[in-house]
């Protein structure tokens, strides 16, 4: 029996809908990629946002991140779910549609709200202390840690911003960091 998700899951395309519905029992809404800026998706999503809540699940690429930013401007209290680049890539194609049902379920379980708090725990010094910036393997570490925390991959500065924006505690960060270093 598939896990039931109460929020509406927002994806980019029709193949993403199929992949998500294969993984969970949920209402899924397609924004048609960058066409979200031109069509009536925002108006339609407002009702779902107010009544059920939204989970934004876009592709783990630049275009997906741009679409996520656009949606988050309109729906600041939506949850964000991330598929890793590794689990979202098949034969050179990157997208939610390539992720396994298990990876989609994991991403949805790790979905996070963006917090509007003024306390930033993570700074450049901490990022350097944990080799998340400035080292040859920093990008790989951020990719693994982003997948473990459910916040996706980003460059160093954006990764630090996500850690703060999603309210990740230092304890949660350290546990995830230890876990990826045991693999």
From Swiss-Prot:
Its cofactor is Mg(2+). Mg(2+) 1 binds at residues 12, 59. Its main location: cytoplasm. The keyword Flavoprotein does not apply. Binds two Mg(2+) per subunit. Residues 6-90 form the Toprim domain. It catalyses: Endonucleolytic cleavage of RNA, removing 21 and 42 nucleotides, respectively, from the 5'- and 3'-termini of a 5S-rRNA precursor. Mg(2+) 2 binds at residues 59, 61. InterPro entries: RNase_M5, RNase_M5_C, TOPRIM_dom, TOPRIM_RNase_M5-like. GO terms for biological process: rRNA processing. One of its GO terms (molecular function) is ribonuclease M5 activity. It is found in: Cytoplasm. Its EC number is 3.1.26.8. Keywords: Cytoplasm, Endonuclease, Hydrolase, Magnesium, Metal-binding, Nuclease, Ribosome biogenesis, RNA-binding, rRNA processing, rRNA-binding. GO terms for cellular component: cytoplasm. PANTHER family: RIBONUCLEASE M5. NCBIfam families: 5S_RNA_mat_M5. Required for correct processing of both the 5' and 3' ends of 5S rRNA precursor. Cleaves both sides of a double-stranded region yielding mature 5S rRNA in one step. Belongs to the ribonuclease M5 family. This is Ribonuclease M5. It comes from Fusobacterium nucleatum subsp. nucleatum (strain ATCC 25586 / DSM 15643 / BCRC 10681 / CIP 101130 / JCM 8532 / KCTC 2640 / LMG 13131 / VPI 4355).
């Amino acid at each position: 029996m598939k896990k039931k998700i109460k929020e509406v899951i927002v994806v980019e395309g029709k193949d993403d809908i199929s992949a998500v519905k294969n993984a969970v029992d949920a209402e899924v809404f397609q924004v048609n990629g960058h066409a979200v800026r031109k069509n009536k998706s925002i108006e339609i999503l407002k009702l779902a946002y107010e009544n059920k809540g939204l989970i934004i699940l876009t592709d783990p690429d630049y275009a997906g991140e741009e679409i996520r930013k656009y949606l988050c401007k309109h729906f600041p209290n939506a949850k964000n779910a991330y598929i890793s680049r590794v689990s979202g890539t098949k034969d050179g194609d990157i997208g939610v549609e390539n992720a396994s049902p298990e990876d989609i379920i994991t991403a949805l379980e790790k979905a996070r709200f963006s917090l509007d708090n003024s306390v930033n725990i993570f700074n450049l010094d901490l990022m350097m202390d944990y080799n998340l910036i400035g080292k040859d393997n920093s990008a790989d570490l951020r990719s693994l840690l982003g997948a473990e925390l459910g916040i996706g991959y980003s460059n160093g500065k954006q990764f630090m911003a996500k850690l703060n924006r999603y309210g990740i505690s230092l304890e949660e960060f350290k546990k995830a960091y230890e876990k990826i270093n045991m693999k």
